[in-house]
């Protein structure tokens, strides 16, 4: 609900087609649930999503091809022609398959350095936060076996192997809420991210 009120305040009356840039974090639960709730109240509007990389979405928004971007906000960018509005904050967590040996290990933190990892891509903000968390924990940086931002790929890889994944909490909430994957009880310090909307300024 907050998403659409924020958009209406900037764009005016919502009608016709609303074009959305969807970053990976928003695609599995946040945006689908928001779209379903919105369309129940506004059945005459068409919503179009674009799942391109962040840089491409920004270029499309500057060109007027996208109305807004939803997902993790970039905290280290100074782009005067764009503005952002946070909806909430969340931390990253470590996911693994149910019955993974680390869930029974007396000190799972000690095993993180030698684990096989599914990680965000090297240039993704989430990857930078994760690296900083490992430095804070006094551990060597995790080395990716697979790099991907696709939630379905992460789920399939974890369910079929002993790999670990570091993701934002909401990105895989369906899997954790429905018992498809488990959370390793090792907190990742200083990985809080702001999740929200990015618009053209003005």
Label each PLM-derived region with a short phrase:
Residues 1-12, 100:
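Alpha-helical "hinge/linker" immediately C-terminal to small N-terminal DNA-binding modules
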Residues 13-76:
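Central regulatory/effector-binding core of bacterial HTH transcription factors
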Residues 45-53, 119-120, 140-150:
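Short beta-strand-to-loop elements that line the ligand-binding cleft
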Residues 70-80, 151-181:
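A ligand-binding cleft/hinge motif common to bilobed small-molecule-binding domains
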Residues 72, 96, 102-103, 115-137:
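Secondary-structure junction motif
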Residues 82-93, 169, 177-191:
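Short beta-strand->loop
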Residues 99-109, 188, 202:
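Short helix-loop capping/hinge motifs at secondary-structure junctions, enriched
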Residues 126, 182-202:
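A late-sequence structural motif
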């Amino acid at each position: 609900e907050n998403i659409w009120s924020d958009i209406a305040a900037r764009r005016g009356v919502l009608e016709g087609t609303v074009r959305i840039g969807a970053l990976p974090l928003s695609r599995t639960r946040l945006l689908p649930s928001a779209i379903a709730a919105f369309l129940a109240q506004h059945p005459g509007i068409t919503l179009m999503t674009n799942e391109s990389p962040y840089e491409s979405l920004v270029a499309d928004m500057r060109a007027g091809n996208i109305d807004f971007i939803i997902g993790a906000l970039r905290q280290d960018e100074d782009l005067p022609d764009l503005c952002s509005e946070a909806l909430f904050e969340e931390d990253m967590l470590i996911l693994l398959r149910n019955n993974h040996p680390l869930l029974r290990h007396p000190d799972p933190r000690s095993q993180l350095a030698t684990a096989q990892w599914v990680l965000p891509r090297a240039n993704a903000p989430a990857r930078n936060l994760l690296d900083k968390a490992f430095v804070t924990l006094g551990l060597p940086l995790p080395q990716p076996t697979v790099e991907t931002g696709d939630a379905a790929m992460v789920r399939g890889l974890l369910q079929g192997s002993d790999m670990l994944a570091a993701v934002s909490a909401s990105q895989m909430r369906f899997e954790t809420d429905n018992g498809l994957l488990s959370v390793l009880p090792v907190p990742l310090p200083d990985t809080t991210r702001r999740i929200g909307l990015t618009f053209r300024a003005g």
